[in-house]
Amino acid sequence: VAAANRVAGEAALHAAAANQGAAHSGAIVTSIYAPKGGCGKTSIATNLATILSGEMKQRVCLLDLDLESGDVQLIMGLPPARSVLDLQNLTDSLDATALASVMLPHSSGTYVLAAPQRPEQAAAIRPHLISRIVNVASKMFDHVIIDCPPYATEHVLAVLDVTDHLGLICTPDAASVKNTAISLEVLTELNFNGSVDLIVNRAGERVGISGTDISEALDHPIT
């Protein structure tokens, strides 16, 4: 929750700055990514969404982009009623009405677009559809939060093009630090234009690499 609060604060600052600039229109898009599983990525994404909607009274949608094994719907206690799979045939004709019809409302005020219920259904979701969803959602909400899978898919690359704010999650172990370093290099190679917040989850544990050492190794400040 502490990590989500920090990212929420950053997102709010981005929103305030965007409101002052004529060049930016629509929602602030925040993508949460971890280069390996088990980093608490989905917990941070769901907490961030509920903080922004419940405490900060923002209009928020949460997109579960972990198409093969996403758990956002389950973690938030929502019924498996609808998902992104219901939009697979609406790529070019997708509009706000169609998108709203498949979103699941949470008690915090967040609207969730769930991942498919079965892994094999992920193949039906094209990257262009995800880009279209983010584009439409950006006109409906103040914040679009995207819970990315722990690997760089074409869908992830598609949303990076429209991401304002990337929460990059690392845990205090050598494997995670190595993979995070690679992720930072890839972002540079892709000329990623958004801001990158490095989040060390479980940084308060007595075992593992310290936050200071991680920041120095990655040459990047920790949020």
Predicted region positions:
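Conserved catalytic-core segment of NTP-binding enzymes
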Residues: A124, H128-I222
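Walker A (P-loop) phosphate-binding motif
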Residues: N19-C61
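Flexible beta-alpha connector loops of hexameric P-loop NTPases
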Residues: V84-D92, P119-I125, D173-A175
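Acidic-aromatic/histidine active-site loop/patch
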Residues: V1-V29, E189, S195-V196, V200
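A short, flexible beta-alpha/helix-coil linker loop
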Residues: P35, S69, Q117-E120
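Phosphate-binding loop that captures ATP/GTP phosphates
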Residues: E55-V112
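Short, hinge-like loop/turn segments at secondary-structure boundaries
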Residues: N5-G9, G77-R82, V186-L187, I214-A217
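Soluble periplasmic/extracytoplasmic beta-strand elements of cell-envelope proteins
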Residues: S31, V112-A114, D197
